[in-house]
A protein has these predicted regions:
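N-terminal membrane-targeting/pre-transmembrane regions
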Residues: 1-31
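Pocket-edge structural micro-motifs
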Residues: 5-7, 117, 131
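Lipid-exposed faces of alpha-helical membrane segments in multi-pass integral membrane proteins
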Residues: 16-21, 40-47, 109
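Short, aromatic-rich membrane-interface segments at the entry and exit
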Residues: 32-41
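Short, solvent-exposed secondary-structure boundary motifs
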Residues: 40-41, 47-51, 94-96, 105
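Conserved beta-hairpin
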Residues: 43-82
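Non-transmembrane, membrane-adjacent beta-strand/coil modules in membrane-associated proteins
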Residues: 69-128
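C-terminal/domain-terminus segments
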Residues: 122-143
Length: 143
């Protein structure tokens, strides 16, 4: 394994979501009683843990391929790679986005990488990936 990075939801975001879900728990508790409130609290807590796991994005580079989530591509089909700062990735995922591009982005990640795809059988022009360590990812892909 040459490179591995996991992008996870920040704790402040999970805390806000949990707070809003707790208002639902309080409503259930006040309307239906203690047992229903405890069940709702357990369900909400489990939902937050599931959300934390489900929204994580795993980026891996080994000797043969690049894996981003469930998608993967052989390193031989990777073209030019560009490390994007906050402003550049904001433009790349909005105004300058190509509808055929593969997007593996998380709104809470402020940096990323744009990887061109050189495969004549694939209509995907590039992959846009959220990454906090873009330079390291590019180095791992190119070596």
């Amino acid at each position: 394994m040459r490179y591995r990075e996991v992008i996870r939801a920040p704790l402040w975001l999970l805390a806000i979501i949990y707070f809003f879900m707790l208002t639902l728990v309080i409503s259930i508790w006040s309307a239906l009683g203690d047992n229903a409130g405890l069940i709702a609290l357990a369900a909400v807590s489990a939902a937050i843990v599931w959300l934390y796991i489900a929204t994580s994005l795993t980026i891996e580079v080994n000797d043969k391929e690049l894996r981003v989530g469930k998608a993967h591509i052989q390193l031989g089909f990777i073209g030019q790679c560009v490390d994007l700062d906050a402003q550049a990735i904001r433009q790349a995922r909005t105004r300058d986005a190509d509808p055929q591009a593969f997007l593996a982005i998380r709104f809470w990640a402020t940096k990323g990488v744009k990887i061109a795809i050189n495969d004549t059988r694939d209509q995907t022009p590039y992959w846009l990936i959220s990454s906090n360590r873009g330079a390291e990812l590019i180095k791992a892909v190119k070596n």
